From Swiss-Prot:
This is Nitrate/nitrite transporter NarU. Residues 1-35, 93-101, 146-180, 228-258, 309-317, 363-401, 454-462 are cytoplasmic. The keyword Transmembrane applies. Catalyzes nitrate uptake, nitrite uptake and nitrite export across the cytoplasmic membrane. The gene is narU.
Length: 462
């Protein structure tokens, strides 16, 4: 055996049987946990990059740019659009190339939009089209979620998948609040003056260096890339062709569960992208950047809790109750907005925190539903055609990972639709109410869908 093969095999797990209790306790658990925590670190940074424009767009006009409100909302929405599209091919990558190698590549390329954005904001003559392109490149970070969640699903047994996926997705989602907490702080610090970065004077006498919000992530991404290269593993049994993963698209439940995930995760990422801009338009006297991080923080932690709670009480039950509360909070939001009166920022903020909480919790519970339902369907279908238990388990793992990737792609569309809907509604009517009415109707439809398809009986094996 060559030295190169020996080095490669250090990271390749050719024998991986997480459903075997003895194997799991003696060997599998430690390996799975190590891969999980490195994955969480990489995904957290990816979410920081993905939602970078939610903090940058609010400040662009303060440093010499002159973009309209609708243009700024568009910049916050575009990363979610490209991220959603890219999640489809990204969902194939782990079975094709291996989780370790793909995590390394997908993390290191995020340095490109961060570095470019840092240069772009230093020149007020930078065209809007350049910012649109950088925003679309930030979408590569959002696509990481599909491959990351699919990869982690290979490492854990069925009984622990809800918790593992909740931790990976929830703490990964925490990157949104980490970015929205750190960015408003670092843009007023002389971090990169040694590289010639100069802040733009503000009315209060401070210097705003928006470059810092982008460049601060570059060294962290480099460290995460090295951690993935030296600390993660590829699973030999996870290898699968694109053709072998496509049949999941024919299953009705993939599309039904996609709608539920669009309503939960799509809301979380959409509100994360657009909340600061929305609050600024409705309550311009409030410095929202000091408070914006708390909503994504609540939602990210709630996602982790959603997976754990669903493992205990059932994903369907948790998801159903959660959608009822999402509809309730959306209805209450109408009462907080400026209309004939000034509105109430305190009430607006508290109700929106409730929306972040339920969107995050529902993201975890719907992902648990997806993992459980697709595993059940695949096991049933393989055994129905006379396949062995080993074959059934192997196909169940591959199909579940493919389904998680496809559904996460559709869910990410909410990150584009929600801020764009707010921007369009404000441009047409001067109010976000029109967009909120659509959200309310969608949540109510999801209550009915969850109850009628999954709440009254087990899903049909199709």
């Amino acid at each position: 055996m060559t030295r190169q093969n020996e080095n490669y095999n250090r990271y390749l797990l050719s024998d991986w049987r997480p459903e075997n209790p003895a194997f799991w306790e003696n060997k599998g658990k430690g390996i799975a946990r190590r891969n999980l925590w490195i994955s969480v670190s990489c995904l957290l940074l990816a979410f920081c990059v993905w939602m970078l424009f939610s903090a940058v767009a609010v400040n662009l006009n303060k440093i010499g740019f002159n973009f309209t409100t609708d243009q700024l909302f568009l910049l916050t929405a575009l990363p979610s659009l490209s991220g959603a599209i890219l999640r489809v091919p990204y969902s194939f990558m782990v079975p094709l190339f291996g989780g370790r190698k793909w995590t390394v590549l997908s993390t290191v390329i995020l340095i490109i939009p961060c570095a470019w954005l840092g240069f772009a904001v230093q020149n007020p003559a930078t065209p809007f089209g350049v910012f649109m392109l950088i925003a679309l490149l930030c979408g590569f970070a959002g696509a990481n979620f599909a491959s990351s969640m699919g990869n982690i699903s290979f490492f854990f047994p069925k009984a622990r998948q809800g918790s593992a996926l909740g931790i990976n997705g929830g703490l990964g989602n925490l990157g949104v609040s980490v970015m929205q907490l750190i960015a408003p702080l670092v843009i007023f610090l002389p971090i990169f003056t040694f590289l010639g970065v100069q802040g733009v004077p503000q009315p209060d006498g401070s210097l705003l260096a928006l470059t810092n919000a982008a460049w601060i992530w570059v060294p962290l991404l480099a460290v995460a890339t090295l951690a993935a290269w030296f600390g993660m593993n590829d699973i030999g049994s996870s290898k699968a062709s694109v053709a072998s993963q496509l049949p999941v698209l024919k299953r009705l439940h993939l599309w039904l569960l996609s709608l539920l995930y669009l309503a939960t995760f799509g809301s979380f990422i959409g509100f994360s992208a657009g909340f600061a801009m929305l609050a600024k338009t409705q309550f311009p006297d409030v410095n929202i950047l000091q408070l914006a991080f708390f909503g994504p923080f609540i939602g990210a932690l709630a996602r982790s809790a959603g997976g754990v709670i669903s493992d205990k009480f059932g994903g369907v039950r948790v998801t159903l109750i959660n959608f009822i509360f999402m509809a309730l909070f959306t209805a209450l939001l109408f009462l907080t907005l400026p209309g004939s009166g000034a509105g109430s920022f305190s009430a607006f903020y508290l109700v929106f925190m409730g929306l972040f909480l339920t969107a995050g919790l529902g993201s975890g519970s719907t992902f648990q539903m997806i993992a459980v339902i697709f595993r059940q369907i695949t096991l049933y279908n393989v055994k129905l055609r006379g396949g062995s238990d080993e074959q059934a388990q192997r196909e169940a793992v591959t199909d579940t990972a493919a389904a998680l990737g496809f559904i996460s792609a559709i869910g990410a569309v909410g990150g584009f639709f929600i801020p764009k809907a707010f921007g369009t509604s404000l441009a047409l009517t001067g109010s976000p109410v029109g967009a909120m009415k659509i959200f309310l109707l969608f949540y109510l439809a999801c209550v009915l869908l969850t109850w009628l398809v999954y709440g009254r009986r087990k899903p049909k094996q199709q």
